[in-house]
């Protein structure tokens, strides 16, 4: 049988084309055991179940609008079971086409019809040997629903790459039709599961006004600008016509069907896991907390989460939930009957040493090599100044003085340290001060706005010099001023006041980390990766054909993003969702992120530009990456610049194949429509910003594509996969502070002297919030077993262009070299920021391109997936 397929031709050599089709049945994604091979039900695809028609790329049919000639329908034949290239759940079939090349030309597209009652996932169709041309591959990677669900034919192009002007005339109408279908501008919704419509909407589905839990609409107004999300077309709420109605937890929010996981991916499981957490485990935790004192008393109490687990009481909701979830893996999350044992893995930051996180060295190291290493900036004026409007906030210049810091400057004056590029700041003061009156009026909240000054020592490490904690003060005249206190490092040891002051300093660092945790989750992570990326996904599908070179370049970096963002709107960032439950701004959180989006700049997302803007690097044409780091041992920047450079080289080489000059780019109608829509619609609330590239030069396109790839891959990896390893241990990165700093002469200060650990853990995130938040971080921080990493593609036949394939191979080789470089730097004892007191090496930007077996699955804290995937 295989010989006949591979030989490819029988009978009249020019009248028949043989090939094969690879698909996955719907229930292949619902199997209980991901390792199982599903072989039942294959026969349903044989006969007339699935039909295919070839479309000519070279000869037109004058009776069909001069479209490419369409061949007769061909049905699937043999089920080819023995080919080792098939992965779990895939089925491969033979197919024979009646097609005479002399009369019909070279096939360039194929029409596929599903005559079943259920959908299937079509991966590829391959023609083995087209006379005079060789093999032709059609890459689909698309769900095919029954033909009755569509108003149009499902058409797939060969894997040739074509600018609109180079598309064969016979195929151009099909290309235009496909984009029109995906835009769906004439379809208002509500969209159904099978729909493929990519349209925009504002964030108006986070609240539930009908239940008395509204949230402001984000996007579409100067006051609350926001990136757009994918439209669902759901009906408005009854009480607020501007708000979209919400779905129950077990219903899936609409995203275009091919954006929903079409692969055997842990993300399906993770999606269910999050829903299980929200709907079942959270109530169980709440019940547990109600039945116990509900507080941690010591670090030892917190360690029990990892060493022994917590026995949660059995509640009926858990058993009901267990029945409703399909996957066995999720059923295992929710055991039947008895107590539910919640046991979490030991976070990396305390695996080697349970106390090293408390050192100033580790606190400072995580600013450069932690989960939020993109906030630190060089201090250029002393004391630090606020940029808040003085008409509303008065003068909020920092109260840190030279006397506070000079003992830690290794003999230098403040000015000498500034002139030597040795003073740095993590400045969250302006980020939070405008919101603290509202935030601190919420129960169990006592949040400071913080500034942290750091000194770059001779050995390349940072030392914290001072922490300023500020609270807002509303004056009679309406002015909101700051009341600030400055804290400086205290040595451990001793008795009496000295011992207490060391704990005061530990609390000061905790208040800083509370600020940083929120900024990381809300801005560095959600806004600056997830939210800003979705408009690019939508615009690419609406305006760039799958045959367009830029579509082929960017597609891997969009995988799962819309689905994950929809899941976030449903369970994480919605009103009353896990984010509001566990992070201090609570109901104000997403509205705050809208205010910060006003200052977001696409141009600043390119890593070299970001580093220069923060003053931690300076332009340097002689440096390999055109910038020179002022903090030489800055793991995020060291690894990030190498990865950025590899991405930029790849984009440069790839795009040069299709755009030999700026004129070709300017004449590319699809590309120009794409960029116009990104700017004017997807990010329309900031369309007038002067930093937007005009997209008139190939250099602008290279930079834009490199930036999009960077955001979806490396930037997201840097802020996502270290969440549990660093913040899974609550005291290291708490999400809330509940009490003010104890002052000398108060009973709170005396309590700190008596039982400092108890005061510390009672000051930070309470037990209920902590367990829920940490449980979520564990889910979000895992790599899936079938992760596709930077420098890999899930479909080897993604293009027929040999030059593009060679450039991609070089890209992968560069990334593999970076892996070796990261390993070597982590072993270099002179690079003290790479590993630090916790003995936890920085590998978040280790590309993992060389891993073809899924070795980095789970909580590995290493690897850069192509896209924003949990």
UniProtKB/Swiss-Prot annotation:
<feature type="binding site">
    <location>
        <position position="720"/>
    </location>
    <ligand>
        <name>Fe cation</name>
    </ligand>
</feature>
<comment type="pathway">
    <text>Lipid metabolism; oxylipin biosynthesis.</text>
</comment>
<dbReference type="GO" id="GO:0005737">
    <property type="term" value="C:cytoplasm"/>
</dbReference>
<dbReference type="InterPro" id="IPR020833">
    <property type="entry name" value="LipOase_Fe_BS"/>
</dbReference>
<keyword id="KW-0223">Dioxygenase</keyword>
<dbReference type="InterPro" id="IPR000907">
    <property type="entry name" value="LipOase"/>
</dbReference>
<feature type="domain" description="PLAT">
    <location>
        <begin position="32"/>
        <end position="158"/>
    </location>
</feature>
<comment type="similarity">
    <text>Belongs to the lipoxygenase family.</text>
</comment>
<dbReference type="GO" id="GO:1990136">
    <property type="term" value="F:linoleate 9S-lipoxygenase activity"/>
</dbReference>
<dbReference type="Pfam" id="PF00305">
    <property type="entry name" value="Lipoxygenase"/>
</dbReference>
<dbReference type="InterPro" id="IPR036226">
    <property type="entry name" value="LipOase_C_sf"/>
</dbReference>
<dbReference type="InterPro" id="IPR042057">
    <property type="entry name" value="Lipoxy_PLAT/LH2"/>
</dbReference>
<keyword id="KW-0560">Oxidoreductase</keyword>
<feature type="binding site">
    <location>
        <position position="525"/>
    </location>
    <ligand>
        <name>Fe cation</name>
    </ligand>
</feature>
<dbReference type="GO" id="GO:0006633">
    <property type="term" value="P:fatty acid biosynthetic process"/>
</dbReference>
<dbReference type="InterPro" id="IPR013819">
    <property type="entry name" value="LipOase_C"/>
</dbReference>
<feature type="region of interest" description="Disordered">
    <location>
        <begin position="203"/>
        <end position="243"/>
    </location>
</feature>
<dbReference type="InterPro" id="IPR036392">
    <property type="entry name" value="PLAT/LH2_dom_sf"/>
</dbReference>
<comment type="function">
    <text>Plant lipoxygenase may be involved in a number of diverse aspects of plant physiology including growth and development, pest resistance, and senescence or responses to wounding. Catalyzes the hydroperoxidation of lipids containing a cis,cis-1,4-pentadiene structure.</text>
</comment>
<keyword id="KW-0479">Metal-binding</keyword>
<keyword id="KW-0408">Iron</keyword>
<dbReference type="InterPro" id="IPR020834">
    <property type="entry name" value="LipOase_CS"/>
</dbReference>
<dbReference type="InterPro" id="IPR001024">
    <property type="entry name" value="PLAT/LH2_dom"/>
</dbReference>
<feature type="binding site">
    <location>
        <position position="716"/>
    </location>
    <ligand>
        <name>Fe cation</name>
    </ligand>
</feature>
<dbReference type="GO" id="GO:0031408">
    <property type="term" value="P:oxylipin biosynthetic process"/>
</dbReference>
<dbReference type="GO" id="GO:0051707">
    <property type="term" value="P:response to other organism"/>
</dbReference>
<comment type="subunit">
    <text>Monomer.</text>
</comment>
<dbReference type="GO" id="GO:0009611">
    <property type="term" value="P:response to wounding"/>
</dbReference>
<dbReference type="GO" id="GO:0016702">
    <property type="term" value="F:oxidoreductase activity, acting on single donors with incorporation of molecular oxygen, incorporation of two atoms of oxygen"/>
</dbReference>
<keyword id="KW-0443">Lipid metabolism</keyword>
<dbReference type="Pfam" id="PF01477">
    <property type="entry name" value="PLAT"/>
</dbReference>
<keyword id="KW-0444">Lipid biosynthesis</keyword>
<keyword id="KW-0963">Cytoplasm</keyword>
<dbReference type="InterPro" id="IPR027433">
    <property type="entry name" value="Lipoxygenase_dom_3"/>
</dbReference>
<dbReference type="GO" id="GO:0034440">
    <property type="term" value="P:lipid oxidation"/>
</dbReference>
<feature type="domain" description="Lipoxygenase">
    <location>
        <begin position="161"/>
        <end position="870"/>
    </location>
</feature>
<keyword id="KW-0275">Fatty acid biosynthesis</keyword>
<feature type="binding site">
    <location>
        <position position="870"/>
    </location>
    <ligand>
        <name>Fe cation</name>
    </ligand>
</feature>
<dbReference type="GO" id="GO:0046872">
    <property type="term" value="F:metal ion binding"/>
</dbReference>
<protein>
    <recommendedName>
        <fullName>Linoleate 9S-lipoxygenase 2</fullName>
        <ecNumber>1.13.11.58</ecNumber>
    </recommendedName>
</protein>
<keyword id="KW-0925">Oxylipin biosynthesis</keyword>
<keyword id="KW-0276">Fatty acid metabolism</keyword>
